[in-house]
Design a protein with these regions (language model features):
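Charge-lined substrate channels and their catalytic hotspots, especially those that engage the 3′ end
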Residues: 1-282, 289-334, 373-374, 670-671, ...
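Electropositive polyanion-binding surfaces
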Residues: 32, 180, 186-187, 213-220, ...
Length: 709
């Protein structure tokens, strides 16, 4: 049954069950009512199951399909390692007590009823009444042999039960192995889940096993199917010169790439000149779509992965290295096919004309961010002499970048400049150092030029009114903005809200006002938390954080599938145009592409964050007993989170604050002593001692050093 037929049948069945004369029936009875033959009943049951999963219909305790009770909600259960959990329903987290979980496991899709409405300062509470679908079918954990059988202790502490492994499902696992387990039975009140070992990742102490375990736990694919590797062998190492007449030739332009020293996938290049006061900026992006054809094995795998994943000891690429480091890498001194966005920009930063075309380029020089910084910021004579033929271009790049940045700032673009970190590992994968990583002049220049190209391409294709993929950042929820406004008022700041909406310029002005103040870090973090997460959509809804009306991701087709997808659309439109049939095709596939791309981006971000937390905890486990300066980055009822200058964050549990009984003030994000009235608040500088760190739990424990507050 195709998607169209499936959706049509869902609509018919949904209307039947919501008819006022309908009475609850079992699936077999509905089949008889609709004269569905026995051989087609499985299709009917799939439709019924889909409607239940979507929460559109319900199932009684006797297995009869019924109208969904308005008091029954459907959502995803998020467990905790303390037994209780939350069900996320349309963005709201509903608290579930341990006794009300109905044996639901982490990520299960469930139905629940509300048992306690929202009270001041407290969430709504609920009770799970039915598990609709289990969310985790595979678990990564440590294998423990126990006689003839075994158990796997899940790495994910939110999966609260050990998994029983029968004797014939152990494979060759031994105690201490990290394994991937397929769950065959999810258990109940009296039985643990049961599963089988499907992969052995290595011993828990083997180098790299810890990070591979995270990769597996997020189900991130890291090995390419055989058909992909066969396809990649057919891709040439050099461009097809017979296609040169069909492309715009930009090989005569002075063109450079600027990347990290170790980068091998150079997918963007820049050309720039100035004539009669007009800047001619060229952003040239590797033409990956020339080699990754729609519906090929390569394309299907790229879509499946969605994005490259950057972990501290490895990169899991979206596309094989032979492609990303070879024909699609804009290497110095070789001809390469590209998609070029050529922009004419006036002295105010306004893009007055542009041209998007398939092109051929030849990069004159491969530069690093460090070298360009030495030229523009450090005025390093040796570096300037080494690249003397390109120095005028770098100066011009800096000049234009400042103009573009100023124009973005004038319209309200918000720049959250939080410190990032670089974790340095030894050959055995142990963390040696954690260094703050800051953007320099060169990285900002490239960001400015990429933003300009992304906006230009987005606006061009918006007005063409053809299906496209946009990068969207929605306006923050009014409740979160009102909470932020109330909080910053404690510090004497205010933001203007009109018709329950806020303009990004208001938040930009707030960032400018707090710059350099003690509360800067605190208010910046709370402002960021008030923002929604950006994602991919087929509608052009704008980008709130950039204050941009039109925005897309055009500049990284090697590592992001949405970029590759729009390259394909652009190339098609540049040729004979997009036919009605192809427009219909894109209208059908792009909603799923954008949804999947947003999900895989979130998965990659979560995995990267998890690995960082794990390595930071491992780093701190070697520094227990040492004292550090830090800043309070979070305040909760259970304690204080303190962030160190190297971005490591740890918890001072409220039980460690033994000099008084501390009460949490949710409105001001403070813990205050009942007797002493001593307060701990966000942004406050403290001295802490590391008292514990768990690589397994990804946690760091601190204790306030009283004498040094």
């Amino acid at each position: 049954m195709d998607d169209y037929t499936f959706e049509k049948r869902k609509k018919v069945i949904n209307e039947l069950i919501h008819d006022k004369y309908y009475t609850p029936m079992k699936g077999k009875e509905i089949a008889m009512l609709l004269n569905v033959s026995k051989e087609n009943r499985n299709d009917l049951y799939k439709v019924l199951d889909a409607l239940v999963l979507e929460g559109k219909i319900g199932v009684t305790s006797k297995g009869k399909y019924c109208k969904n009770d308005k008091n029954i909600l459907t959502g995803i259960f998020q467990s905790t390692d303390r037994g209780f959990g939350f069900v996320t329903v349309e963005g709201e987290d509903i608290f579930i007590r341990e006794s009300d979980t109905c044996n639901a496991l982490h990520q299960d899709k469930v139905q629940l009823v509300i048992t306690c409405e929202k009270k001041e300062g407290r969430r709504r509470e609920g009770r799970i009444i039915r598990i609709l679908e289990h969310g985790m079918n595979q678990i990564v954990g440590i294998f423990r042999k126990n006689g003839a059988y075994g158990f796997v202790i899940p790495d994910n502490r939110k999966f609260s039960k050990d998994i029983f492994i029968p004797k014939d499902k152990i494979r060759s696992a031994v105690t201490g192995h990290k394994v991937v387990v397929k769950i065959n039975s999810f258990g109940d009140d009296t039985h643990n889940p049961e599963g089988e070992v499907i992969r052995i990742l290595g011993h828990v102490n083997d180098p790299g096993t810890d990070i591979l375990s995270v990769v597996e736990s997020y189900e991130i694919p890291y090995e390419y199917p055989e058909e992909v590797m066969k396809e990649i062998e057919k891709i040439p190492d050099e461009i097809d010169e017979t296609k040169l007449p069909l492309r715009t030739d930009y090989r005569m332009l002075q063109t450079i790439t600027i990347d990290g020293e170790d980068a091998k996938d150079l997918d963007d290049a820049i050309s720039l000149s100035k004539e009669n006061g007009i800047y001619h900026l060229g952003v040239h992006i590797a033409d990956v779509a020339e080699y990754v054809k729609e519906k090929s094995a390569l394309d299907k795998e790229a879509l499946n992965r969605g994005t490259s994943v950057y972990l501290v000891d490895r990169v899991i690429p979206m596309l094989p290295h032979k492609l990303s480091n070879g024909i699609c890498s804009l290497n110095q001194g070789v001809d390469r096919f590209a998609l070029s966005c050529m922009m004419d920009i006036d002295s105010t930063g306004k893009i007055i004309d542009h041209k998007i075309s398939e092109s051929v380029i030849n990069v004159d020089r491969r530069m690093s961010y460090t070298s360009v910084k030495k030229i523009l910021t450090d005025n390093d004579i040796d570096t300037i002499n080494e690249y003397k033929d390109f120095v005028p271009m770098f100066k011009l790049m800096e000049e234009l970048a400042i103009i573009l940045r100023k124009k973005r700032q004038q319209r309200g673009s918000i720049d959250f400049d939080f410190p990032e970190c670089k974790i340095v590992l030894d050959k055995a994968g142990r963390p040696l150092d954690i260094k703050p990583y800051e953007r320099n002049t060169a990285t900002k220049i490239i960001e400015d030029f990429m933003l300009a190209a992304n906006e230009t391409v987005a606006e061009d294709y918006f007005w063409q009114q053809i299906p496209f993929v946009y990068r969207t950042h929605d306006t923050p929820d009014k409740d979160k903005i009102n909470e932020l406004a109330a909080f910053i008022n404690n510090f004497g700041y205010s933001i203007k809200v009109s018709n329950d909406e806020i303009h990004p310029k208001e938040l930009q002005k707030l960032m400018e006002k707090i710059e350099g103040s003690e509360e800067e870090n605190l208010i910046s973090r709370l402002t960021l938390r008030a923002m929604k997460r950006a994602g991919y959509t087929v509608e052009c809804k704008g980008h709130f954080g950039l204050a941009a009306k039109y925005y897309t991701h055009f500049t990284s087709p090697i590592r992001r599938y949405p970029d590759l997808q729009i390259h394909r659309i652009i190339k098609e439109s540049l040729h004979a145009g997009i036919t009605d049939k192809r427009i219909k095709h894109y209208e059908n596939i792009l909603p799923d592409v954008t949804k999947h791309a947003s999900q895989t981006e979130r998965r990659a971000d979560d995995a990267e964050r998890e690995v960082d937390k794990m390595k930071k905890a491992e780093y701190m486990s070697l520094r227990i007993g040492k004292t550090f300066s830090g800043v309070i980055s979070g305040v909760t009822a259970w304690g204080l989170y303190v962030e160190l200058p190297n971005t490591v964050e740890g918890l001072v549990h409220v039980n460690e604050l033994t000099d008084d009984y501390y009460i949490f003030d949710q409105n001001s994000y403070e813990l205050y002593g009942e007797v002493s009235h001593k307060t701990y608040k966000l942004g406050m500088k403290v001295r802490v001692k590391c008292t514990g760190a768990s690589k397994v739990l990804r946690t760091v424990d601190f204790q306030i050093v009283e004498d040094d507050i």
